[in-house]
Amino acid sequence: MEILRATTTAGRAGAYYVRIQAMARKHQIPLDVEFDEHDTPDTKYIVAVDNYLPIATCRLYAIDDAKVMLGRIVVLPEYRHQGIGTLVVKEAETWARELGFTTSVVESRDNKIPFYESMGYVADMEQKIEGETFTCFRMEKNL
């Protein structure tokens, strides 16, 4: 298994594949909701691949000069609970630091908060985000 920075069309296609399989299909999320205004040519993606097949992803985009949003973090169901999500997030954080960001932000579903807390993120339970599909809470970590 490899954790890659998706800097090519093929890499981005891998990120999109994982999101379609694990989110759009599973939760019946329309593509124009899953792929939103933050999926731009400047958006960065991390992709985990196993035997050349994409199995996990994360996207990164700037909130401002100091903060980066890590989002659409997803691992295909058959690969969950093997530490792959942690590896993907850690690579995204490394890339964000290299790009000059000092704070990482995630918007986590409530049942995933312990996952992010295990990596040093702190939840702000006052910042509840009612999305079209899920209710999430903002979490931050100093990079």
Enumerate the predicted regions with their spans.
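Conserved acetyl-CoA-binding loop-helix of GNAT-fold acetyltransferases
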Residues: 75, 81-94
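Conserved acetyl-CoA-binding loop of GNAT-fold acetyltransferases
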Residues: 117-126
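C-terminal "cap" of GNAT-fold acetyltransferases
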Residues: 109-110, 129-143
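Conserved GNAT acetyl-CoA-binding A-motif
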Residues: 89, 96-109
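A conserved beta-turn-beta hairpin within the catalytic core of GNAT-like acetyltransferases
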Residues: 62-71, 80-81, 130-135
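Short, solvent-exposed loop/turn elements at beta->coil junctions and helix N-caps
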Residues: 32-38, 126-129
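Conserved beta-strand in the GNAT
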Residues: 47, 53-61, 69-74
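Short amphipathic alpha-helix that is part of the acyltransferase structural core
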Residues: 1-33, 40, 45, 49-50
